[in-house]
């Protein structure tokens, strides 16, 4: 299957993730086992994303996450792979920046793409946070979900993006290089939001963050 996709669709980049079940299905129980087979490299895959957990994982212990990230760093260097970290979605910049710095201190050298929840109602964000089982962000969004009047209010990630931008600018060694959006509020809405930011159609707010300028 991989060989067919790689040839017919010219696939050169994949995201390899594992976990999420109590009992592994099949012969692999973690992403490193797949990486070590060499099947990706053999089929011309030149760019590989692996999971990042700024808030930890409900399925994997923190010390195991740390060990796995160190192993992936070593493997990327050994195999000369173009590898990067793709993270779960988050809501608070301070937490993400602290995680990145700690991972760097622990030896991480892989560039990082941070998961950003696209514009969506608080009700929708709360539902996805529940499904993902993430911790601090769950508590963050739960506080807002507790206000019934705000449940259908569309939440923008402007404070998260602004906070990350400030942190990245202040720490030149920061390994956060890209963002990727989770289109919880719909693909079109998320795409329009991302395009507006890319085009610079934003206005800074006096109380922090920014807002999109509607054309």
Give short role names for the model-derived ranges.
Residues 1-67, 176, 186:
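Active-site beta->alpha loop and helix N-cap motifs at the rims of alpha/beta catalytic domains
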